Amino acid sequence: MDTLLAPTETARRDYVRAMAAQHRAGGPLQREFYTSPDIFQEDMRRIWGRYWLYAGHTCQIPRTGDWLTYEVGSDSVIVVRGEKGEIRAFHNTCRHRGSRVCPAETGNSRRLVCPYHSWTYGLDGQLMMDTKGDFGVDRSELSLHPVKVRAVAGLIFISLSDNPVDFEDGFATIARKLAPHGLERAKVAHQIDYVVKANWKLVFENNRECYHCPPNHREYNTATYDVHRDNGNFDPKLKAEMEQIVAEANARFRSLGLDEGDAQSTMTGAHWRCHRTPLMKGFTTQSLDGRPVAPLMGDFKERDAGTLRMTVFPNFWQHANDDYACASRLTAIGPAETHVRVLWFVDREAIEGRDYTLDRLLPLWKLTSEQDWDICQWNQQGVSSSRYVPGRYSLTREQNVAHFVDWYLSEVTK
């Protein structure tokens, strides 16, 4: 049965559709899509409320009773490691009077105990106290509300919808391509939280192209060959060199038993993508000098496995090398504000100071990320101007941004 929308929700939906009708294909969105509180509410309902969202990595909750919470809009979700090692997720709201059950961000508990009146739940979400006599209802009717959750190759995805957007092909591809990296046997070496003063779509649009990389990402440019392609530099000699690098790298990936193909969803705009690419000649990992920064991870026995790039709309991207991985989790918190958590992962047996140091592990992606946040904030300031008029995307260097916008408009207007 269709959900009955309140009058304000109906008006918001109609407003979004009217604004979408003004969009000119091949160009950026209208200003209101980056600034309007009403459109932001529709984003949260139609996109963030329906899609699978990256919540964390399984290695963040390795032991029975370990849990983390993830805030999305007005919702909070508990992700917990169950008695048999399974990953479960629940709405973080007590079935008594609605208090947060787990007010902290992480913890370990044999039971989930609400701090308000000590209502106690098992790690399976079942209420453990008798309520029939005092409350007139059987405790089986008062379990924590479950949340859809999938753990795939060390990644945890949750969905706030009872009927989330289909992601089965994505889960299967991620499981196959990411498995050699052994992220379920990793640990968080470091994390940094940022509040980026920009709409979440601008942050993701920036991630979808490297046209901006040559003037902004000196460190990233030294490690990544396809920056030159995205910058429109099609010098025949460079093109031939890149094609040779790719051919040699793919042969090496196959010899290592790695799936080197490019895989993405077949939906409009492709809401997920997963592909392995080579690094610049002389680079075995994404570091400032190309040299390893940590011990090999997962199943790798030798170095130079390129980098496995993953993107999942609306809130996740990750680069996984053979010695470390760096993941970014976006959370939309307002029309012009996005929380971004950047996490670095290494093998769980690696010891800081002996096997890796943060001054070598962090710089490339810390610098690149912070450069991006500046760009996104300047972009937000510009599109907020009364004089902003959407321009045009490059046909050869920003096609992925156009695909993202197509995907977004298709989903937010449904």
Locate each region found by the language model:
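N-terminal pre-ligand scaffold of iron-sulfur
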Residues: 1-104, 148-152
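N-terminal short leaders/motifs
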Residues: 9-37, 98-112, 143-153, 257-295
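Short hydrophobic core segments
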Residues: 43, 93-94, 113, 203, ...
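Short Pro/Gly-enriched beta-strand edge/turn motifs at strand-loop
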Residues: 49-61, 129-133, 310-314
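Short clusters of hydrophobic/aromatic residues that line enzyme substrate/ligand-binding pockets
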Residues: 55, 101, 127, 388, ...
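Rieske [2Fe-2S] iron-sulfur-binding domain
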Residues: 60-180
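C-terminal catalytic domain of Rieske-type non-heme iron oxygenases
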Residues: 150, 155-414
